[in-house]
């Protein structure tokens, strides 16, 4: 049979052409969704109900991606981003949408993902919301040393890039920390070791403000004196982290950051949690308190109950649960955080609380310390708790509270719980990161009788 040459469409011309798109919704990553020639097109920066001009940047079999060029018909939810670094910084990717619009989108996306991938429809509860700006109590800034100008800049990574975007302030960082960025940049440029400095971590704790400077070689006495003087002038605790991961206070003493929980409850004394810079801590203090309070309300811990807290970290949920009378078993995969959790329990005088280091993907049901479990709290990383749920079916806790930072893994894991006889009773958004697309959630499951 004769073979005839047939020219393929000029894909490069299709990609370079600017076209008009009608956006009808957002995906769970905050990108606008449009239809074009039978394909779904994802357009970051576009909002529902908008007509936009965009340029195709990627063509796949079933979808395409495009770069927003111009908004022709703006949405009523579109606002002018307040941050001068918005276009280049990779952090706050929904600043162009009103705060109310962001929360409405996130709540709807959460319900949609759970219904679509888990077949679960829970009793939606009001979202946990707080301040839209200056809510972060912790941030890590990258350093960029220019070999030509011999100048060091502080900033955040650009979107989908390792490039550092220099900044002098941050509107989602706690105001006292944001105000320290420019002075710190000036200070670090005065150090002889500025070319060997790593990241700068800023922390706003209940016992003061903290800064951690990553160093790759020891600082001389003059540099140390400058840091100590800056710390005194700005009333901030500065420590250095060396190549071995050890921390050293610039004034000779090392003070660790602390935050409190239950300090707003009239019927309970507060618990204090100390944490080491570098270890995980929820960055939104206001929402973390609300999240812990909601988990306590849903689980209603009682004396005599045994509650298992998986992925317990340094005790963010474990200590408050134990404070209200339940016997709590906390399991964590990071040894350093288990040690910190044990120290926190001892410092708060809690004896009804034990912590264990364990591989959370392995079967822990046969461990001698496990025993009968009445209720379960899960707070996994983005990957979820799929492996853990495989052995938890043997435990059959009456209630499961699942705290999630990824709705996709929550939906997948929810399907497992539903198959095992649990019913989704409550589902709610946790708006931990306003101005960004990130969706966090809490779900309550109860074993069907």
Swiss-Prot record:
Class of enzymatic activity (EC top level): transferase
Residues reported in the UniProt entry to bind [4Fe-4S] cluster: 83, 89, 92, 170
Any Gene Ontology biological process: rRNA base methylation
Binding site for S-adenosyl-L-methionine: 282, 311, 316, 332, 359, 379
GO MF term set: 4 iron, 4 sulfur cluster binding; iron ion binding; RNA binding; rRNA (uridine-C5-)-methyltransferase activity
Keyword terms: 4Fe-4S, Iron, Iron-sulfur, Metal-binding, Methyltransferase, rRNA processing, S-adenosyl-L-methionine, Transferase
EC assignment: 2.1.1.190
Coiled coil regions in record: none
Pfam family, one: tRNA_U5-meth_tr
Iron-sulfur is among the record's keywords: yes
Active site: 405
Catalytic activity: uridine(1939) in 23S rRNA + S-adenosyl-L-methionine = 5-methyluridine(1939) in 23S rRNA + S-adenosyl-L-homocysteine + H(+)
TRAM domain mapped to chain residues: 12-70
Entry function: Catalyzes the formation of 5-methyl-uridine at position 1939 (m5U1939) in 23S rRNA.
Family listed: Belongs to the class I-like SAM-binding methyltransferase superfamily. RNA M5U methyltransferase family. RlmD subfamily.
HAMAP family documented for this protein: 23SrRNA_methyltr_RlmD
Name recorded for this polypeptide: 23S rRNA (uracil(1939)-C(5))-methyltransferase RlmD
């Amino acid at each position: 049979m004769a073979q005839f040459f047939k020219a393929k469409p000029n894909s490069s011309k299709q990609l370079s052409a600017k076209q008009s798109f009608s956006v009808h919704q957002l995906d769970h990553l905050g990108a606008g969704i449009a239809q074009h020639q039978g394909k779904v097109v994802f357009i970051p920066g576009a909002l529902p109900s908008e007509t936009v001009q965009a340029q195709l940047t990627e063509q796949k079999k079933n979808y395409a991606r495009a770069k927003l060029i111009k908004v022709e018909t703006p949405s009523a939810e579109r606002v002018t981003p307040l941050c001068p670094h918005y276009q280049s910084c990779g952090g706050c990717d929904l600043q162009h949408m009103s705060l109310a619009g962001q929360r409405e989108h996130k709540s709807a996306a959460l319900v949609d993902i759970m219904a679509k991938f888990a077949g679960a429809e829970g009793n939606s509860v009001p979202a946990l919301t707080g301040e839209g700006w200056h809510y972060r109590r912790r941030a890590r800034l990258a350093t960029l040393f220019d070999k030509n100008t011999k100048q060091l800049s502080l900033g955040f990574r650009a979107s989908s890039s390792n490039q550092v975007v220099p900044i002098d302030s941050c509107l989602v960082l706690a105001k006292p920390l944001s105000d320290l960025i420019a002075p710190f940049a000036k200070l670090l440029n005065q150090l002889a070791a500025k070319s060997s400095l790593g990241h700068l971590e800023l922390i706003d704790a209940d016992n003061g403000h903290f800064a951690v400077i990553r160093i790759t070689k020891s600082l001389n006495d003059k540099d140390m004196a400058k840091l100590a003087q800056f710390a005194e002038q700005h009333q901030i605790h500065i420590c250095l982290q060396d190549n071995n991961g050890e921390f050293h206070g610039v004034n000779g003493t090392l003070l660790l950051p602390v935050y409190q929980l239950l300090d707003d409850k009239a019927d309970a004394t507060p618990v204090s949690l100390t944490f080491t810079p570098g270890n995980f801590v929820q960055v939104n203090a206001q929402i973390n308190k609300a999240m812990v309070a909601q988990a306590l309300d849903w689980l209603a811990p009682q004396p005599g109950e045994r509650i298992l807290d998986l992925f317990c970290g340094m005790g963010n949920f474990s200590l408050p649960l134990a404070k209200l009378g339940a016997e709590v078993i906390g399991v964590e995969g990071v040894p350093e955080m288990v040690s910190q959790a044990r120290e926190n329990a001892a410092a708060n005088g809690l004896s009804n609380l034990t912590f264990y280091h364990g591989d959370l993907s392995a079967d822990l049901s046969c461990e001698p310390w496990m025993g009968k479990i009445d209720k379960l709290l899960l707070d996994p990383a983005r990957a979820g708790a799929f492996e853990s749920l495989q052995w938890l079916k043997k435990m059959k806790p009456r209630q499961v509270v699942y705290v999630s930072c990824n709705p996709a893994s929550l939906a997948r894991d929810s399907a497992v719980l539903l198959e095992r006889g649990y019913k989704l009773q409550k589902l709610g958004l946790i708006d931990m990161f306003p101005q960004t697309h990130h969706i966090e959630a809490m779900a309550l499951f109860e074993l069907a009788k």
